[in-house]
Regions:
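Collagenous Gly-X-Y triple-helix signature in extracellular proteins
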Residues: 1-204
Length: 204
């Protein structure tokens, strides 16, 4: 991984990852595929990233799936969790994360800046169905082993705090959000795609 480059696909742990950013000897990487499907939270209540079950899972059980050598290369960072700029729902406090989801702002930074096209004033503001842009294809992801695309979570809030933002199956940014818990946990309808991201120390 010495010759790591922006946009490259790299193997780390049990997954292939896309390199989104390089800063000094660190690389921001995100899984190429949707590696699993989970709810954002385990209860239908107002929540932000700091307290959601998906964050706890990524920084405990998922983090612990890496071996000791790999864990040493995963560098914790302080993440800014901004309010939803279209609906003013709260993003919550900054968090220290080893593993995390991208925010709306990071999705725009690394997969093409679509913020100007998200401006669709109106009661329903259904950008992802009404407006398409050239960056959609960059954000499309598929579950591992599947041929079709599916939607995946962002950590940012949706229009209210019982919803979290997401990337639609066609690559559009869902600024209104999906319910953090879609149905009951037992019925299998509460899940969304998970593409973990992390800052990785580049081997010398």
């Amino acid at each position: 991984m010495k010759d790591i480059e922006l946009g490259a696909s790299v193997s780390f742990g049990c997954y292939f990852w896309r390199v989104l950013d390089i800063q000094s000897n660190l690389a921001l990487i995100i899984t190429e595929d949707i590696i699993e499907e989970r709810p954002y939270h385990d209860a239908y209540k107002d929540i932000t990233w700091v307290d959601c079950e998906l964050r706890k899972y990524l920084n405990s059980e998922f983090y612990d799936s890496f071996n000791i050598a790999d864990k040493r290369r995963i560098i914790p960072v302080i993440n800014k969790n901004l309010d939803n700029q279209w609906y003013s729902s709260k993003g919550g406090v900054d968090t220290r994360d080893s593993i995390f989801l991208l925010s709306i702002e990071e999705a725009c930074r690394y997969f093409g800046d679509s913020r100007s096209k998200l401006q669709n004033p109106g009661k329903n503001q259904k950008y992802w169905f009404e407006r398409k842009d050239e960056n959609n294809s960059k954000r499309i992801a598929r579950p591992q082993g599947k041929e079709w695309a599916s939607w995946w979570w962002l950590r940012s809030p949706g229009r209210v705090n019982v919803k979290a933002a997401y990337i639609h199956g066609d690559g559009n940014i869902g600024i209104q959000g999906n319910n953090i818990l879609k149905g009951n946990i037992g019925d299998g309808k509460c899940i969304g795609g998970v593409r973990p991201a992390l800052w990785l120390k580049i081997e010398e």
